Amino acid sequence: MKKIILLFSLIVLIGCKSKKPDTTTEAIPEVVTFVRLTTTEVDANLKTKAYQLGKRILMTCNTSKFKPFNKSEATRSVIDNITEEKLSKTCAKFRQRYGDFKDLKLMQIYKDNETRTTIFRYKALYTKAVANKELRVYMNDQSQVSAIKSMDWSDTFERKLFRNTDTDTE
């Protein structure tokens, strides 16, 4: 009989679920790294410089002449990566699909507080109506182009793979 009571007690003890402590996890506040800026919040010289450098890249498609960036205009990685050969290949595709480049229209400006980069979103205007392209010019805190990216235009801003800016100042 003692064995049956002991076995029954053991089964009851194992069968009882222990009550989990009521732990509430605090919601970690989401860190906002991108802030949309108005055109008046950005220095006029920086806007002009971003526009001119972005336009210089796309005008290469019309003129076939590219003036390379210097150290005061762009970071070392941008200078090394933008070559006349690479631009020629890209321009050949763009001219065939979209026609001649006309101009850039500034649509939005964002500040990435994590990398201290100002991102200028331009809509690239071409002669063919089917063209719906975006040119992003990333300017670091030394007013240098740290990246340039061309993609299809989207009304919503997305990070689009660019993470690490080159911050050399040589």
Where are these regions (language model features)?
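Hydrophobic alpha-helical targeting segments used for export or membrane insertion
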Residues: 6-11
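C-terminal motif of bacterial Sec signal peptides marking the signal peptidase cleavage site
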Residues: 14-15
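Short solvent-exposed beta->alpha transition segments
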Residues: 67-116
